[in-house]
């Protein structure tokens, strides 16, 4: 068999593999709704001094439903989520913590299947309670109302991908950033389904420029 023929076969197989991967990624469910959400990384100036102006300016556009925040971007990097440990059932256990605003799950359409979601009243607590994922519920034998790491488990979310598809799901909790110094530097802007996305994104850019011309 000629060398060119072998190379052609390899290229055809590679192309088929890439198409299958693309098809899989298009159909693969992350467990949250990213289609109507625009993610914007902010600088500290906006978050520290102009957060209310930022949210208020965005909501002047009728197609924008809500704005949520987090310390890191969900599902962007496997190693960007805080890893913590706790003493539980007489052993050390490790889990990942994702710090976000109280409306984050609703903006991202991550369902809470047991218990409840965060509310604004939870912001008044000295330290944040948790909403856990199914892996934490399974591995740590936890349920809504249980105590874990000196916090109360408020609810259990629907399963979703917080890291890449190549890594198995592991214990993960959502927490409000009441008790950490890190600012929330990522914003998630949810549009309704009838929004003109091009116009809405232009409004986001204009809002940012009005607050910080250097952005």
Predicted regions and their residues:
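N-terminal Sec/SRP start-transfer signal
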Residues: 1-6
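Alpha-helical transmembrane segments
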Residues: 7-35
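Membrane-interface junction motifs in transport/secretion proteins
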Residues: 27-51
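Short, hydrophobic beta-strand segments
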Residues: 38-41, 83-89, 187-189
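Structural motif
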Residues: 42-45, 70-71, 133-135
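"Rare, low-scoring activations can occur
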Residues: 49, 55-67, 134-143, 150-215
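Short amphipathic beta-strand/extended segments in non-transmembrane regions
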Residues: 55-118
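Hydrophobic secondary-structure segments that place a key small or acidic residue at a functional site
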Residues: 94-171
């Amino acid at each position: 068999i000629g060398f060119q023929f072998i190379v052609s076969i390899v290229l055809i197989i590679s192309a088929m593999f890439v198409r299958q991967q693309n098809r899989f990624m298009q159909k693969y469910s992350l467990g949250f709704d990213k289609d109507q959400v625009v993610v914007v990384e902010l600088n500290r100036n906006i978050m520290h001094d102009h957060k209310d102006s930022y949210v208020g300016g965005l909501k002047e556009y009728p197609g924008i439903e809500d704005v949520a925040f987090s310390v890191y971007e969900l599902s962007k990097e496997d190693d960007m989520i805080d890893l913590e440990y706790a003493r539980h059932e007489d052993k050390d256990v490790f889990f990942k913590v994702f710090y976000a605003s109280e409306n984050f799950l609703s903006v991202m359409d991550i369902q809470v299947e047991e218990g409840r979601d965060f509310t604004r009243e939870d912001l008044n607590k000295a330290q944040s309670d948790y909403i856990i994922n199914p892996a934490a519920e399974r591995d740590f034998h936890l349920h809504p109302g249980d105590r874990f790491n000196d916090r109360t488990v408020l609810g259990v979310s629907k399963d979703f991908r917080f890291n890449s598809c190549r890594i198995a799901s592991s214990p993960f909790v959502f927490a409000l950033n009441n008790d950490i110094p890190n600012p929330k530097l990522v914003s998630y802007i949810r549009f309704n389904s009838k929004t003109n996305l091009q116009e809405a994104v232009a409004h986001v850019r204009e809002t940012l420029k009005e607050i910080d011309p250097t952005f």
